[in-house]
């Protein structure tokens, strides 16, 4: 029980299905079965589907019979021996052929009953209750292994009857139909024929297909007789029946009772929407996806048929495949119908013939697990699992329901999951959503379920989508099917998860099954017997599985994040770069967990690849040329021997079942040609992210395409041309797809995952890199550096403000205070700009959002640098609870211009002013070039440190503007009033960079006169003050002024002439010229920041070479400090005589300041 709950939890952890599905009544019922034992099974609620409800109604007498039987047993507890014999006779009577597998259970039941009876002196009420409980526990254990789910127990009698009816030997027609199937995998399916009815896109790519690759829906099964006859659909029905019957001949005596007798009537299977159970263990239900999108009952077997047709090299092989398929069909029945011996079926079938068993472990062998998931709860679970036309609406429903149910119910998963996809449909189908990587994710998921799934399934099939990428060579697939057959993308999809499960889980589940019941024990024994023909293979597989346990769990956790794959590519590139540097001979070393770039190359050299197939390896590629990435679970990824690229033969690594890593470096291999030459029209080069080619692109277009990485492609192209030309379409030799301009564009922000599919893609680029020579090693580090710089940003918000020591408040903004602080870690001084979130309704201040957003896009030496963002809480929960504050961490600047000018502690000369203006205009010009308007330039926002460096700060009002759309209005209330240009004062909303130039002109004048040029407290008063110096805004000097909204409301008492040059005649002529141009009333005539930098006054100014101004290093002069100081001086002056106050009036060069007049 505990193992079951743990398994359910583990599956839930890695499943994409929302946890709310556990509240589903059916899921709850299933959980109840697991918790209370099958003995407490309640009457099931009506099935959601009509067919199922019908089937369940038919099976209801069976359920009632069981309930009565249990009640009778309770009443007859005084005669436990009789009860045990009754139970035994009941099971034996229904299925006399199952005696070998049930005998042990029966005898144990009788012994147990006798012991109870003998140990009890008298049968009183307490003993009766205790005995009832013990019987329930025993029954629970026994039925858990049988997967006697609530909804399945009703179907037992019918299934038995149907099983008996279908145990006839194979008819000649069936045998002919079986033998007529293709025994050699055809060439890779063409895009148009890839799927007949399935609703998914024609080219199945795990990463891209959202619909077909959704968690609940495995890839479509394809037609065996079309171009893509890997994926047989139309011909599956006949093949299924034929194969199934053939299988029955072999397995009939060894099949367990519960498995065989639980399939619904054949009539129910004949319809596309019928139940998911096969009529009998031997006859897989026909495939219904070809005819309808509804739940094909025998989709499990259908998939197997199509797989066998694709990969079987001979009728003999196909028969074997059929056997496995059939047993899987029963596995499905048994999985949810409570048959504990479906596992017997598979194992025994394998045990029948060592020769056949050899093929059982080849990739061509269809997975043993599919049928197990047949639950009967919903229409066509098998179909839902194997057919992709359900991908849309049904996949979601099935995924939610079945994945949870199967994972939660130990009974359901117990021995059935051994033959079914990872203990839960969702795990199988979810795999497809994640593409090749799903195998890892769900492999782990499955491993967490306490079931026998790992046993047979480990050999059973390759991974769904990834199954396609491996050839059928027995060696490569070995026993694990890790390089599972190039199964129809959907066929093995749900299977491989099992075989990915860790041996640890396998052992644990075995223990669970043995503890659960004698029948479970018997199935265990049968399983061990069935594995005997390949015991050495299994031992080898277990050893490798043990090595992969940690990797599997890591894959399952990391594959969830799509972006992490891209990071893996980068890491591989980095490692391979190192390898290329270290290996002077050019040998290519693949990353630890990387699997082969080309899953087919070893098979090309492998003599055991399908004889009838001209393109054995090509068969294992999907129609879009991408190999399914999932079926590499058991590669010894840490010790993949890499041959020298100078080797002329492919050296495969049978010990690790490495289909390919060995041939990765062999760019000039003639052996690579056969796998791809025949299928070159269907195969497209694999992109770095395993994505399909863009619309309208095909392999021929890319054959001579140049790689986006110039250094690499130069020589790799030569290699491609010299080796096999366009015929050699190996992934190793194909050019980079134009969609992705080289790995340089890959995002480096993501964490690294060790998913084999991720290593395949990068290997493409790295192969070119090795071919290209050392030039590539110079390019790659750039990516890593870029990634590092981005990663720094990801730390924002992770630190607490406690790492800083607050020293003093130096300012106050619209949304918080500004503090001077010291970083404890680096001992650097920083400025912390606090962002208060106390106004919850308003949310995060838009000014702060803009500042953060814009500063992240600006990088200039004259623009303040935003280091990071910190919070004042230790964790997010605390922050959310208390509505804390954010702090923007800036580099610290000792002063601002306002504080310096008002302090009276500095006396900037012309050279200092020129340096300040040059730096200010340099930063402003950078902003304007980036199409940003600052919109708040004033002295307090111009920062300066003690070294004389000037930086533009406070981008809270800044915004991006569209230089091409001058008609777009922006807010008019920007820029501090004293620095606001006349167009804004007159209501202009369609403004541009000229507003910032006006503000800079005000600062230029202020540098020379030591106080603001235009001081007023209202907009019209401000405009009047400007008019006194710069002249009145009239159409004669400003033609467009009449278009401004407030022009006609302007009631000036008199028209002023421009007297700027007269008032500022003390300024140097070049500086005065610049001031005159910057303070032009007409924004269209106003000088730009770029032109101002070229002005005679600033053209030759280099701030770095100029002497540092004499600044008060003992005092930080900021606006806040200046205001406090001014207040104190005012208070002091109020106590002084009026003559003293008058003497403090400031005049320079004999010019009375504006505002004093």
From Swiss-Prot:
**Which CDD domains is this protein grouped with?**
STKc_CDK12
Catalytic residues, chain numbering: 936 (proton acceptor)
Cross-referenced InterPro entries, in alphabetical order?
CDK (IPR050108), Kinase-like_dom_sf (IPR011009), Prot_kinase_dom (IPR000719), Protein_kinase_ATP_BS (IPR017441), Ser/Thr_kinase_AS (IPR008271)
From start to end residue, where is composition biased (Basic and acidic residues)? 55-76, 315-332, 392-403
Give the Low complexity compositional bias ranges: 163-176, 256-281, 408-422, 473-484, 518-533, 609-623
Where composition is biased (Acidic residues), the residues are 18-32, 746-760
Query: What GO CC annotations are associated with the protein?
Result: cyclin/CDK positive transcription elongation factor complex; nuclear chromosome; nuclear cyclin-dependent protein kinase holoenzyme complex; nucleus; polytene chromosome; polytene chromosome puff
User: What residue spans carry the region label Disordered?
Assistant: 15-540, 574-661, 675-782
What family does the Swiss-Prot or TrEMBL record give for this protein?
Belongs to the protein kinase superfamily. CMGC Ser/Thr protein kinase family. CDC2/CDKX subfamily.
Protein name per UniProt: Cyclin-dependent kinase 12
From what organism does this protein derive? Drosophila melanogaster (Fruit fly)
Could you tell me the gene encoding this protein? Cdk12
């Amino acid at each position: 029980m505990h193992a079951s709950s743990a398994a359910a939890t583990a599956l839930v952890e890695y499943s994409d299905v929302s946890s709310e599905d556990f509240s589903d009544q059916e899921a709850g019922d299933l959980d109840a079965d697991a918790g209370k034992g099958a003995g407490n099974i309640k009457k099931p609620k009506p099935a959601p589907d009509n067919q199922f409800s019908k089937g369940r109604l038919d099976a209801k007498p069976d359920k009632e019979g069981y309930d009565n039987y249990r009640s009778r047993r309770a009443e007859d507890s005084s005669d436990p021996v009789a009860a045990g014999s009754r139970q035994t006779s009941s099971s034996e009577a229904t299925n006399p052929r199952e005696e070998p597998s049930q005998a042990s259970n029966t005898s144990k039941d009788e012994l147990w009953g006798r012991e109870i009876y003998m140990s009890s002196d008298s049968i009183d009420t307490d003993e009766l209750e205790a005995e009832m409980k013990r019987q329930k526990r025993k029954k629970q254990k026994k039925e858990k292994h049988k997967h006697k789910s609530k909804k399945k127990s009703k179907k037992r009698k019918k299934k038995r009857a149907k099983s008996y009816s279908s145990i006839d030997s194979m008819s000649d027609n069936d045998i002919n139909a079986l033998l007529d199937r293709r025994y050699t995998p055809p060439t890779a399916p063409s895009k148009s024929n890839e799927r007949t009815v399935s609703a998914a896109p024609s080219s199945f790519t795990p990463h891209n297909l959202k619909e077909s690759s959704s968690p609940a829906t495995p890839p479509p099964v394809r037609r065996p007789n079309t171009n893509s006859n890997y994926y047989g659909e139309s011909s599956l029905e006949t093949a299924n029946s034929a194969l199934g019957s053939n299988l029955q001949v072999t397995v009939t005596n060894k099949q367990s009772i519960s498995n065989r007798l639980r399939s619904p009537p054949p009539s129910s299977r004949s319809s596309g929407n019928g139940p998911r159970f096969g009529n009998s263990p031997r006859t897989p239900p026909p495939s219904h996806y070809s005819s309808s999108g509804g739940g094909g009952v025998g989709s499990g077997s259908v998939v197997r048929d199509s797989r066998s047709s694709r990969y079987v090299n001979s009728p003999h092989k196909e028969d074997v495949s059929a056997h496995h398929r059939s047993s899987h069909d029963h596995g499905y029945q048994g999985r949810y119908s409570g048959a504990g011996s479906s596992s017997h079926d598979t194992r025994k079938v394998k045990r029948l013939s060592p020769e056949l068993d050899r093929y059982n472990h080849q990739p061509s062998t269809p997975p043993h697990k599919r049928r197990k998931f047949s639950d009967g709860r919903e229409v066509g679970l098998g179909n839902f699992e194997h057919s992709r036309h359900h991908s849309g609406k049904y996949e979601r429903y099935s995924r939610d329901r079945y994945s949870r149910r199967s994972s939660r119910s130990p009974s359901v998963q117990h021995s059935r999951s051994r033959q079914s996809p990872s203990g839960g449909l969702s795990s199988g189908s979810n795999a497809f959503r994640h593409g090749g990587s799903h195998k890892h994710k769900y492999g782990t998921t499955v491993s967490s379920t306490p079931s026998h799934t790992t046993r047979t399934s480990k050999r059973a099939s390759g991974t769904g989508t990834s199954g396609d990428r491996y050839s059928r060579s027995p060696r490569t697939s070995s026993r694990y099917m890790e390089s599972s057959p190039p199964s129809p993308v959907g066929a093995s999809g749900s299977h491989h998860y099992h075989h990915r499960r860790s041996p640890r889980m396998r052992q644990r589940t075995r223990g669970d099954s043995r503890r659960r019941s004698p029948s479970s024990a018997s199935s265990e024994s049968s399983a061990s017997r069935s594995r005997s023909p390949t015991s050495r293979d299994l031992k080898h597989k277990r050893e490798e599985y043990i090595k992969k346990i940690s990797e599997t769990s890591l894959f399952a956790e990391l594959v969830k994040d799509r972006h992490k794959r891209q990071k893996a590519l980068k890491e591989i590139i980095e490692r391979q770069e190192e390898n290329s540097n270290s290996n002077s001979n050019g040998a290519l070393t693949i990353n630890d967990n990387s699997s082969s770039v080309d899953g087919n190359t070893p098979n090309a050299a492998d003599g055991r690849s399908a004889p009838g197939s001209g393109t054995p390896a090509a068969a294992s590629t999907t129609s879009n040329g991408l190999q399914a990435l999932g079926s590499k679970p058991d590669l010894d990824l840490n010790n993949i021997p890499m041959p020298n690229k100078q080797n002329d033969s492919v050296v495969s690594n049978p010990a690790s079942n490495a289909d390919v890593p060995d041939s990765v470096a062999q760019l000039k291999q003639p052996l690579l040609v056969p796998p791809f030459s025949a299928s070159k029209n269907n195969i497209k080069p694999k992109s770095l992210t395993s994505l399909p080619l863009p619309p309208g692109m095909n392999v021929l277009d890319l054959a001579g395409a140049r790689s986006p990485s110039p250094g690499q492609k130069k020589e790799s192209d030569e290699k491609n041309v010299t080796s096999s030309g366009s015929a050699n379409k190996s992934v190793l030799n194909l050019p980079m797809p134009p969609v992705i301009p080289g790995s340089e564009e890959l995002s480096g922000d993501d964490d690294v995952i060790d998913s084999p599919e991720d290593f395949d893609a990068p290997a493409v680029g790295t192969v070119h890199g090795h071919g290209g020579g050392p030039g590539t090693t110079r390019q790659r580090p750039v990516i890593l550096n870029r990634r590092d710089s981005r990663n720094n940003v990801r730390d924002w918000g992770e630190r607490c403000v406690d790492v800083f020591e607050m020293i003093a408040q130096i300012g106050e903004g619209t949304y918080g205070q500004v503090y001077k602080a010291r970083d404890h870690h680096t001992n650097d001084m920083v400025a912390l700009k606090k962002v208060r979130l106390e106004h919850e309704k308003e949310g995060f201040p838009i000014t702060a959002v803009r500042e953060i957003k814009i500063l992240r896009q600006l990088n200039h030496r004259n623009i303040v640098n935003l280091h990071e963002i910190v919070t004042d809480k230790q964790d997010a929960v605390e922050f959310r609870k208390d509505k804390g504050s954010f702090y923007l961490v800036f580099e610290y600047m000792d002063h601002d211009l306002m504080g310096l000018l008002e302090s009276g502690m500095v006396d900037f000369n012309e050279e200092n002013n020129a340096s300040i203006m040059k730096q200010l205009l340099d930063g402003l010009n950078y902003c304007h070039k980036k199409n940003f308007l600052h919109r708040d330039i004033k002295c307090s926002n111009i920062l300066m440190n003690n070294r004389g460096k000037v930086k533009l700060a406070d981008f809270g009002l800044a915004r991006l503007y569209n230089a091409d759309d001058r008609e777009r209005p922006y807010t008019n209330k920007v820029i501090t009033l004293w620095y606001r240009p006349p167009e804004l004062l007159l209501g202009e909303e369609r403004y541009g960079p000229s507003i910032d130039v006006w503000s800079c002109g005000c600062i230029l004048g202020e540098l020379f006169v030591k106080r603001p040029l235009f001081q007023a407290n209202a907009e019209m008063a401000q405009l009047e003050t400007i008019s006194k110096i710069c002249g009145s805004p009239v159409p004669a000097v400003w033609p467009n002024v009449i278009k401004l909204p407030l022009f006609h409301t302007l009631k000036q008492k008199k028209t002023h002439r421009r007297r700027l040059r007269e008032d500022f005649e003390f300024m140097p002529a070049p500086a005065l010229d610049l001031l005159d141009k910057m303070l032009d009333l007409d924004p269209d005539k106003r000088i730009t920041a770029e032109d101002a930098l070229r002005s005679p006054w600033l053209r030759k100014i280099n701030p770095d070479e100029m002497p540092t101004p004499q600044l008060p290093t003992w005092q930080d002069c900021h606006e806040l400090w200046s205001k406090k100081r001014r207040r104190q001086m005012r208070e002091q002056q109020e106590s002084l005589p009026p003559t003293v106050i008058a003497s403090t009036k400031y005049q320079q060069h004999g010019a009375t300041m504006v505002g004093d007049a």
